[in-house]
């Protein structure tokens, strides 16, 4: 390709709403063009990037034994009702009605469609296992689309679905997909972490996310200093807590030794002041968290959570706790002071004693770190009073769950070394769906005993368009994009410094033909522009490398620059065969 024929328009300035460098560079480099909120066109350079990513993903998926299909972008709403997700998914699911009053959705994910395919195709265990995948556009009606391709409303995704006769085979395929995704990310030259994750609206269990490490990542990852453990903060675990965190101790770290008693605590409404009042570490206090749980029909109720005073509640964990038995709640919101008072409680003095009797609440949960704990201080459900000497082992029927957020300094559940936070961009997610969808949609097969069984399913998503900003957030520099060779739009750009110099022109054009004949994807920059402009474009667009044909040619020299690190190589240009060997060796 000759640069003069390339449909691209680079910009010096970034759009005002482009916060992340990936968004800025993709717009400035002419890779993408915004046409609506969270909706982008992919111009030739952007489309070629997508094709490179698609090729890697398809090659690795096919190698794993999966088969590619293509499902409709539009899905009948009845399939989503059949699975039970039509109401559960919320307003991110774009719904519409056609001229015949038939209801449809734009698919953000395709579990329902693939289950429908399997239901009408798979009849016997002899047809299993089966793994089908597609690479297709999706639509999620994000409330606040932002950060360019990182969180758009329309996006391109590889979503795969596997079907099995038993859980052992699902586990095998899950491991195969984990290894496949690792190979994909390694081929793209990325530093990443595989972490435990929450299954969210997809459902199922055994969920893992693939995080590209980057400071701007939306996800907080909890990572161990001593082993390979890692988890999204929403699903992170920690070793049992038996003492305050050493780095947070402010008052006496020992358990307060006091008989059970009711104390007058005037205007002591938060954990900080409670800890100061009794001169004890916050670890020995109980923090009450009151939330309003929202159902699909917009009905709501107050739910109650208790954690150690030096902990915070983790919202996803808390939502999972109340959904453990009914799975009818969509979200949690902070309860207002008025709502708490209407329940008969005083803000700042809420405690475990008599709570169910006062509020008639269905959902009251205690964090696992409080299981059978003693020597505690909690609210007395009475204004200006707290209880000391609280012993939860004397309570009957308490429901415990992992609802606290793991904090830096907590200990790893696997090796007991310290945990710390880092940031990541989720680019892949794999799930063990089990029979969640097959039971709901009656997708069955006959086992080897002739008995009807629900299909066992797995689900595997990879963000084709999202990986582009992820690469840039990790790899790019202050000058522009940096793409690895496998992803770069062109393997090498030949930049003719002075197009008015016939020697430079002839040499550059001849080398362009030689490299192209060798199967190298080459861009010949023969534009009548200043050399500085051409170099700025090379740095912005991030092609893997560039060969500079300039004044050095008079002395039999050309210069090769690798975009990552801008490392320079001076090459002898007198023998084109030797020069070709050197170029191929460096850009390999």
UniProtKB/Swiss-Prot annotation:
SUPFAM superfamilies in alphabetical order: Class II aaRS ABD-related (SSF52954), Class II aaRS and biotin synthetases (SSF55681), YbaK/ProRS associated domain (SSF55826)
UniProt cross-references to InterPro entries, sorted A to Z: aa-tRNA-synt_IIb (IPR002314), aa-tRNA-synth_II (IPR006195), aa-tRNA-synth_II/BPL/LPL (IPR045864), Anticodon-bd (IPR004154), Anticodon-bd_dom_sf (IPR036621), Pro-tRNA-ligase_IIa (IPR002316), Pro-tRNA-synth_IIa_bac-type (IPR004500), Pro-tRNA-Synthase_IIa_type1 (IPR023717)
Keywords in alphabetical order: Aminoacyl-tRNA synthetase, ATP-binding, Cytoplasm, Ligase, Nucleotide-binding, Protein biosynthesis
Superkingdom as given in the UniProt entry: Bacteria
Pfam name, any one: tRNA-synt_2b
Keyword set includes ATP-binding: yes
Catalysis: reaction(s): tRNA(Pro) + L-proline + ATP = L-prolyl-tRNA(Pro) + AMP + diphosphate
Subcellular location: Cytoplasm
GO biological process assignments: prolyl-tRNA aminoacylation
E.C. number: 6.1.1.15
Enzyme class, first EC level, given as a word: ligase
Gene3D superfamilies in alphabetical order: Anticodon-binding domain, Bira Bifunctional Protein, Domain 2
GO cellular component terms, A-Z: cytosol
GO molecular function: aminoacyl-tRNA deacylase activity; ATP binding; proline-tRNA ligase activity
Matches recorded under PANTHER family: MITOCHONDRIAL RIBOSOME PROTEIN L39/PROLYL-TRNA LIGASE FAMILY MEMBER, PROLINE--TRNA LIGASE
Subunit structure: Homodimer.
Biological function: Catalyzes the attachment of proline to tRNA(Pro) in a two-step reaction: proline is first activated by ATP to form Pro-AMP and then transferred to the acceptor end of tRNA(Pro). As ProRS can inadvertently accommodate and process non-cognate amino acids such as alanine and cysteine, to avoid such errors it has two additional distinct editing activities against alanine. One activity is designated as 'pretransfer' editing and involves the tRNA(Pro)-independent hydrolysis of activated Ala-AMP.
Entry comment, domain topic: Consists of three domains: the N-terminal catalytic domain, the editing domain and the C-terminal anticodon-binding domain.
Similarity field: Belongs to the class-II aminoacyl-tRNA synthetase family. ProS type 1 subfamily.
Protein name, entry field: Proline--tRNA ligase
Organism this protein belongs to: Helicobacter hepaticus (strain ATCC 51449 / 3B1)
Gene of this entry: proS
